[in-house]
Design a protein with these regions (language model features):
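Karyopherin-beta/Importin-beta family HEAT-repeat alpha-solenoid scaffold
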Residues: 1-161
Length: 161
């Protein structure tokens, strides 16, 4: 199955698993593959979200949440004066997919520690998006209000993290 933009999601999962490996050689190869994948945030960020939504391995989901947060956190400009944040290089459509799918991940995630990491990613994404233009994520505030009103204690916690 190919992820958005052409990543083979099974191969991408193997890269994430290799990042978790105790084998230094395997981990170094995975880090290099991830460095190359970062050149294409249009496919990388949706691939993180896809694994967050569909992968059964909690370690993979956890790592994807952390890597996604780091990807949207890297703000600033490169030496060439280009935006260095992966988020800044996404199309409006890809940004929308990432934003809406991340909110869905909060709802569907069953592991508390992973949900917290997803909330951290949403928080960082929110800081970046809302700093640029508050109207760019109109679903965020209604989602948070609904989560606080939910009868689900996990959603209360997620809204307040």
């Amino acid at each position: 199955m190919a992820a958005a933009g052409g990543f083979d999601i099974a191969q991408f999962e193997q890269i994430i698993l290799a990042l978790l490996s105790p084998d230094n050689n395997l981990r170094n190869q995975a880090e290099e593959a991830l460095r190359q994948a970062k050149q294409s945030p249009e496919t990388l960020l949706p691939a993180y979200v896809q694994l967050l939504r569909t992968n059964q391995n909690p370690q993979v989901r956890s790592m994807c949440a952390v890597l996604l947060r780091k990807s949207v956190m890297q703000a600033g400009t490169s030496e060439a004066g280009e935006a260095s944040s992966s988020l800044a290089r996404l199309s409006a459509q890809a940004k929308q997919v990432v934003k809406s799918e991340l909110l869905a991940c909060i709802v569907s995630e069953t592991e508390r520690h992973i949900r917290k990491k997803i909330c951290d990613a949403v928080g960082q994404l929110g800081v970046n998006v809302l700093t640029e233009n508050i109207a760019d994520w109109p679903e965020l505030m209604p989602f948070m209000l609904e989560a606080t009103r939910s009868g689900n204690p996990s959603m209360h916690e997620a809204a307040l993290i």
